[in-house]
Structures are given as structure tokens and as C-alpha cells.
Amino acid sequence: VEKKDIVKTMTSSGTSGQSVSKIFLDKETASLQIKVLSKIMADFIGKKRLPMLIIDTKSIISNREKFSARTAGVLGFSIFGRDVEFALDEDMTINFKRVESFFNKYKSENILIFGFTFIIWKHFVLELEKVGRKFNLSKSVLFHGGGWKQLENQSVDNIEFKNRISNISNISNIHNYYGMVEQTGSIFVECEHGFFHASSFSDLIIRNHQTHSSELNGSQGLIQLLSVIPKSYPGHSILT
């Protein structure tokens, strides 16, 4: 696309510290990302916007032109919320007064909670456990993704994560999702049985790491991610 048509520049450092890649978005691609994400999320929360708590700091969305996968996630999911509140102060500690006020205000409603997995774990779950605090959020739905490598280093798997979340909040409606900044909008969301699902707008193929031929179900290999969204950059097919 022409430089004048670029409305957003997204950056990704990769999962293993590779050099930063830049993804340039024009208005059409940015719009498609939102439309597709909205279609996917409607299957889980309906079309009505919910009161929303983000387990992060407000400063994460300060730069609207250049932002990371974390920023893109917060901005993308926040369109499904209303009266959006941030749970953490700038020093990454829980603002209990703000959080309790939010929960009390919407105690009779369904609440949408969003955050990145490792941030939720380190700065919300562990902190609540440390101070012995619990919330009754049984009517809430939690979406989270990213940061699993850091949790695996602490021997925390998906089951342990969900159990500990449930213990401090009574949340049972928890959905992990997989996405990458190179294909923002094309997320794969975990169902209630623990399986990730491809939407009508994306797909994935497991390929042999030597021959690159497609593998049978249940096999391990390289992941080829496919998406119909990108218009302003070559992100339709990515091998990861």
C-alpha cells in the first residue's frame, strides 16, 4: 500500500526474541480485523456489549499508531465492552478500590474480563492469593491469551490456570485464545471442552518440519496459519 494509506503500524518481537517485524495496516484491513473478531466473539458473548474489566494498565493503549500484540489485544477486545475499567495501576499492582467499585456496580450483570495470560496469572491471581482476597464473579466470562511460555516455566498448565482462577473468583466460563499480531483478528478460541476452533475466516495446517507436507490429525509439526483478512501486507499464509 501507499505510505499515505497506512493508518496503523503493529510490531511483533516474536516468541523467541527475534528482530522486530512491522505490520502496516490500511483502513480496509483494520476494519476487516474488527469485523472478523466481532463475528467470532458473538458466538461466545452475543452481540450485546458487556461491562468490561481489563487486567492491565491503562497506559497500554496510550499509543494508537504504533502498538504491540498486547496493545492490539486490549484495543480489539475492548470494542465488546462498555464502561471499560483497568484493574492494574501503572506499577502493575491491583487497584482494589477501583476493582471492587466496578464489581459492585455490575454485580447483577454479566461481565467481560480480558487480559494476557501471564499478566493475569502474575499480577492478579498470585496477588489475590497472597493477600487472601476473593471475588464472586460467577456470572463473568474471561478471555485470555499469550505468555504461556513463562507459565510453563513455572509448571502452570491450562488446567492449573483455570482452577486457580476459579478458586479466587468463581469464574467457570474461561476461554483461552491463540492469535498473533501478524494475523490480528484471526483468533482461534478455546471451546468449553478445551479445543481451539478455526473460524470461517481462517484455518491452520500442520506440516512436516522436513518435507512441509501436511500431517494427519494428532501429529506434531510446523503450523501454517491462513487468514483472509490481510489486504495491506502479505500475511495470508504464515509458517510458525
Description of each model-found segment:
Residues V1-I6, V36-K39:
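Flexible, low-complexity linker/hinge segments
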Residues I6-I23:
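Conserved adenylation A10 loop of the ANL superfamily
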Residues K8, I23-S31, F67-R70, L128:
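"Short basic amphipathic alpha-helical interaction patches in structured regions
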Residues T11-G14, I55-K58, F118, L142-G147:
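Short loop/turn segments at strand-loop or loop-helix junctions that form parts
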Residues M41-L75:
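Conserved AMP-binding loop of ANL adenylate-forming enzymes
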Residues L75-T240:
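Active-site glycine/GP-rich loop and adjacent strand/helix microenvironment
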